[in-house]
UniProtKB/Swiss-Prot annotation:
Protein's gene: rplE
GO CC annotations, alphabetized: ribonucleoprotein complex; ribosome
Signal peptide: none
Species of provenance: Bacillus licheniformis (strain ATCC 14580 / DSM 13 / JCM 2505 / CCUG 7422 / NBRC 12200 / NCIMB 9375 / NCTC 10341 / NRRL NRS-1264 / Gibson 46)
One GO process term, biological-process aspect: translation
NCBIfam families hit by this protein: PRK00010.1
Pfam families: Ribosomal_L5 (PF00281), Ribosomal_L5_C (PF00673)
Keywords for this protein: Ribonucleoprotein, Ribosomal protein, RNA-binding, rRNA-binding, tRNA-binding
Name used for this protein in its record: Large ribosomal subunit protein uL5
Family under the similarity heading: Belongs to the universal ribosomal protein uL5 family.
GO molecular function: rRNA binding; structural constituent of ribosome; tRNA binding
HAMAP family documented for this protein: Ribosomal_uL5_B (MF_01333_B)
Function: This is one of the proteins that bind and probably mediate the attachment of the 5S RNA into the large ribosomal subunit, where it forms part of the central protuberance. In the 70S ribosome it contacts protein S13 of the 30S subunit (bridge B1b), connecting the 2 subunits; this bridge is implicated in subunit movement. Contacts the P site tRNA; the 5S rRNA and some of its associated proteins might help stabilize positioning of ribosome-bound tRNAs.
């Protein structure tokens, strides 16, 4: 069993039940899924860019991402409907906990001038969105093979009803929020 999942079951669940006075264990918020999205704007001119993004996302997430395509044509961006413009991957279960553990303990501390992540990125429904400026913070990415520095969005979807509950859950899991 994953280290974070074990910690969640043994320590975090009882602590959250006590703090928020839940009557049932099923009311305790948990992480449902993590969605990693990488927009590749230069895929419009360069079709190979999407392949490198898919490859990098595969290394980072441990599973193959799905290529996202344009829903509408936008003349200003020279974009046609159906053109590949990004890649996303949804992690659940064991892989989700592995990725979160790696993100908290290895990747985030590698960010330059890292002082913690913002507390304001909750959406009001208990989900947290985190933007990363470069994919090089992940240990799986080989620095020499990177063609272009790309950022990504990481959305952590929880079953929490409020932001306060979700913040407490992520703090207990070890998310380094700003003081």
């Amino acid at each position: 069993m994953n280290r974070l999942k074990e910690k969640y079951n043994k320590e975090i669940t009882p602590a959250l039940m006590k703090k928020f006075e839940y009557k049932s264990v099923m009311q305790v918020p948990k992480i449902e899924k993590i969605v990693i999205n990488m927009g590749v704007g230069d895929a419009v001119q360069n079709a190979k860019a999407i392949d490198s993004a898919v490859e990098e996302l595969t290394f980072i997430a441990g599973q193959k991402p799905v290529v996202t395509r344009a829903k509408k044509s936008i003349a200003g961006f020279r974009l046609r409907e159906g053109m590949p413009i990004g890649a996303k991957v949804t992690l659940r279960g064991e892989r989700m906990y592995d990725f979160l553990d790696k993100l908290i303990s290895v990747s985030l501390p590698r960010v330059r001038d890292f002082r913690g992540i913002s507390k304001k990125s909750f959406d009001g429904r208990g989900n947290y969105t985190l933007g990363i400026k470069e994919q090089l913070i992940f240990p799986e990415i080989d620095y020499d093979k990177v063609t272009k520095v790309r950022g990504m969005d990481i959305v952590i979807v929880t079953t929490a009803n409020t932001d306060e509950e979700a913040r407490e859950l992520l703090t207990q899991l070890g998310m380094p929020f700003q003081k």
